[in-house]
Swiss-Prot record:
Organism: Cryptococcus neoformans var. neoformans serotype D (strain B-3501A)
Residue stretches making up the Helicase C-terminal domain: 473-618
EC number(s) reported in the record: 3.6.4.13
GO MF, any single term: RNA binding
Motif (DEAD box): 344-347
Lineage, broadest ranks: Eukaryota, Fungi, Dikarya, Basidiomycota, Agaricomycotina
Protein name per Swiss-Prot or TrEMBL: ATP-dependent RNA helicase MAK5
Amino acid sequence: MAKIDKKTKLKLNKKSVRAPSKPTTEKKPKKYVTADTLTWKPVKTSSFSGIDGGGGMMMLEELEDVGIEWEETDGGRKIAKFVEVESKTSKGKKNAAQEEPNQEGRGDDEKASSASETEEGKKADDKEAVEEDDEEEFPDFAGFAEEDLNAADEEEHPNLDDEPAFNDDLLPEWSSISLHPSLKRSFLASSFTAPTAIQSRAIPAGITGRDVVGVAETGSGKTLAYSLPILHYLLGQRKSKAGIKRPLSALVLCPTRELALQVMDHLNALLKHALATPDGEKPQGPPRVSVGSVVGGLSAQKQKRILERGCDVIVATPGRLWDLIKADDELATSVRTLRFLVIDEADRMIENGHFAELESIVKLTQRSTAQQGPDDDDPVFQAMATLFEESTAREDMQTFVFSATLSKDLQKNLKRRSRSWKGKGKRSSTLEDLVEKLDFRDENPEVIDLSPEGGVVSSLRESMIESTKDDKDLYLYYFLLRYPGRSIVFVNSIDSIRRLLPLLTLLQLPVFPLHSHLQQKQRLKNLDRFKSNPKGILIATDVAARGLDIPQVDHVVHFNLPRTADAYIHRSGRTARAQNEGFALQLVSPDEKSVQRALMKSLERTHELPDLPIEAGFLPSLRERLRVATEIEKAQHRATKATHDKNWLLEAAEAMDIDIDPSMLDGEDDDPDAPYYKPKKQDRGKGKASVENLKMELKALLQEKLVARGVSIRYPTSGSKVIVDDLIKSTGHGMLLGASTSKAYDQVEKTGKRKLGSGRPGAVKKKKVEGR
């Protein structure tokens, strides 16, 4: 037997003395209660839950501090029984009462071993108990008097009268508009020295409480025209106290996600300079004015958290916002009590059948007279009364409506034959539609129409290239090489993007797609890449036609003509913004000629667009490059399609839990039109080899220099075009040897010489054959 020394025995005795005794808790018998004796609480549900169909659910109630046990009967059925459970508060008090005698007992044991140690432990325990009690009574503001809290709050949120005045001599053009001094300091920091025409007229009206309908050319600063009155109002209000959710004051509705995010960025950029400290640093704490976005394609949970935190301004697309409103009664109440409602690109937003959610959102802001319903006296319906139904729309809400076009004539489909308006009176205008759908508080809204003649800005020059449908790719490739710069190519379908994108990528052009089928993150990434590349090419549908303010877009190419004139105006408005020069090119095939004439007539043009000069000497080499790239694209498309069809067949068979005939996958069936057709191995090998050969051929063609007619590479000082000076000074064209470096803007005149509808010089006119 091992001996235990004195030191070890002493340690064991100390451990046994200090070991706390475990409290013995007696198990109480369960107390079952009936459903009638419980305290049921009604659950507040959304007022819009019935819109999507609630499955007949009219009302919900909930219970607290009740457990459920399931008892199985002889027949196998389960019956729920309610068990009374102690609430958390009572349970906490009992635990505290049980801990006190344990602490006293532990103190007695320690006293037997060491009296001094016990006294120190007792003091520490008493001190901790006092601190815990204080924390329970004052969780947030312990040790502060109410007067001190109010004083601290006033220091954190200073009085607005202490805002330093702005010296109008620094910005004399803005002196006539009485905006908040912080906004004018932001203008000075951003070198925004003078308002545009639409801003100088819309901002004073918005500040004085008027409803504004503004029509102005693209790139004229409409975003600031409606944003500045809102920010002026918000900066004039007291800051919301810490811990209190700030109310929603303004809602900006946009047709596309990209436009909504762009508007939010513009507002934040303006506020960044307006709210900066004198040192130019960002102020500490929550922002004075909070701006958030609610758009589709991004995390809905994150947007819900932003809304729950509270925002002064929300920029949203109607679809996602309405989805959140249907699930959140508090958000619906915030929209009903708005101070500002803004509809950007209004002509697009109010088109019939396009934005059904917009009408539902607008109805929330409409004033309606209270009517007694047949079920209002029913106690069940009274219990269902929600926060939204108890709220009322504001009488002082301001409505701002802005767009580049507000004309019904510009919204007609040009491919359809124009029909005479057979209704009584004149055809309703877009402004009349706005008055019907929007509840303007102003009896006579301020209508500002600054739309330019011809629909486009004066700094934009337009031209066209008439070609066959098959040669459009050739002339597009020529234009992008001949006039390098940031260009947007508009097409009418996503299929056109999917065809052009791999083609231009094979030709080593920096091209990026943008269409509605892309995920939102990918769309934003492509936009950022396009903005950062001075020679970037964006192939887009009309999703990029409205509102996007991309700096320094040199060219807009209408690969397919738009279906409406207002779409043409908005497409062309992506260039020539803020009085900068811009160029728009139309690629017109014979079957689009009638649409092009109708387009020009709807824009009240009297002359044809001038033709863009083409240097035909480059076309044969470009055509050969394009031919090889097209063959590669078709071969790759066939291989991708075959793999896709096979994968689809396997997934469908697995989903239906059926077996596939091996012949369908082994390629025994030689029908190339069948979805399960699989070429033989030797054919696949030949296909891969041919694609590799084509890629090598294209690589060699791309390395060859493109030389204009009359230029000699061996003898640069001879020939009809002397290029020796350009080679020495490096002033020639980077891609096309012998081509000039002039811009497309300088290659055409402002208007064409031929009248609209007149034949081309030298064209053979068809004679009408009259019947006998």
